[in-house]
Amino acid sequence: MKSIIQQIAKSNKEREAIATQNRQQEIDNPATSNNRRNFLKKTALGGMSLTAIMGLSFEDTIAQTTSKVKRESKPSELKITDLRYCVTTVLGRTAIIRIDTNQGIYGLGEVRDGADPRYALMLKSRILGENPCNVEKIFKIIKQFGGPARQAGGVCGVEMALWDLCGKAYDVPAWQLLGGRYRDTVRIYADTPEAKTPEEQLKLIKYRTETQGYSWLKMDVSINEIKDIPGALVNPNIFKEGSSQWQGGYMSYANTRHPFTGIQITEKGLEAMAKIVDNVRSMVGYEIPLSTDHYGHIDLNNCIRLGKALDKYRLAWLEDMVPWQMTEQHKTITEALETPTLTGEDIFLLENFKPLIDNHAVDIIHPDLASSGGLLETKRIGDYAEEKGIAMAMHQAGTPISFMANVHCAAATQNFLALEHHSVDLPWWEGLVKTTDGRKLIDKGYAPVPLSAPGLGIELIDEEVKKHLHPGDTTYFVPTKEWDEKRSHDRTYS
């Protein structure tokens, strides 16, 4: 192989010498136009041509072509040696994972908020010894262990960490490995602040938009907010705990799908919910997109009635009106309303987004990268939706690790609208990390895309993370040898 390259190099070196001589003769020729002469001079000064590179020694050729690769890392020889974790109190309980290698570099990922870190730990035995730069290969090995919502947390967390590692190994940002970027900043959407009085809420909204700089907001419009109004709901007391979507228990309201609760909204209830939106819209104005979410577990007909009552407020979208699996119901709602519909935060893999996209059952898809499959799979989801004329917003509720993974994916996906930030009012959230290129994590409602920082472009500030470990598990990236042994045959076909 070496002798072949050297023969090619010798031949190209001779051609380069002839090309250089001919170029100089044309530059010196008085008949050559100034524009042509300037162009020829620039080609001579603009860097090494392919033939020039081939004219180098074999060793110099390798050095030139791998000049961006970190010298302390040999990507082709990287091997995964460990997977460790810590659990933070971000959004109650969110785990960060770290994948270590034989060359001292590591990658950071995140198991989705509320998910068990064991979703990631059980994958360790499947990836030990693998080269982390073979991201797609490893993803295909482990994706069978993912599922909807938090069940995908382990697979997606590992995938995030692999892109962080790969970017560090090749000294390029993760977005570059996804094919390049469409934008230098990523627009963020945030929740509308809640308050006890309209005057206080107006003050908080102005702070959110004018001081913090957020130009896209989202509010909750829940039947839980009208449950105490007499005559607002039919069948409101069937569930003893009320109508909170956060209840536990398998027979609770929260675990009863929308068509099966028997709860209906009366005209009085619709007026009350519309008034809630009217109040916020009047404070926000119409220059800022306003999205809505968390309506409650109501059936298809009540979703349409509520949507029509809110159409006049020109909302950016109605989110998750029914469970994502109910494609036909989503399509019926979408066709009945003027307001855009959206779902997707609990969907794993492109194949499960396709029914919604192919049937144009929603106007906007809304993957959560920590559930949808990680950076590359989420970009594929966005690209597929783009072909069908559907936009993509991104759900995100986690630490700065998943936040930055989303930023890289959003930068690399053309039909992107806005990225959710669920910890705007958590004062210590940004302090968990430092950016490796000195940029701000968030600047006036936008996330600057790391233009040169390798991988995800952030590192943990250990002493700060340790202040916010979950009391149920205060370990911090300790070895996990108990997860080294693989104990099953994983092939899914015979």
Residue spans for each PLM region:
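N-terminal secretory signal peptides
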Residues: 1-35
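N-terminal twin-arginine translocation
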Residues: 32-41, 50-72
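Metal- or metallocofactor-binding catalytic centers and their adjacent structured scaffolds
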Residues: 102-175, 488-489, 493
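Ligand-binding pocket scaffold of soluble enzyme catalytic domains
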Residues: 108, 169, 203, 391-392
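Shared catalytic-loop signature of beta/alpha-barrel
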Residues: 125, 130-134, 308, 314-317, ...
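Metal-dependent enolase-superfamily TIM-barrel catalytic cores that perform enediolate-based chemistry
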Residues: 185-331
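Extended hydrophobic packing segments that form well-structured cores
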Residues: 456-494
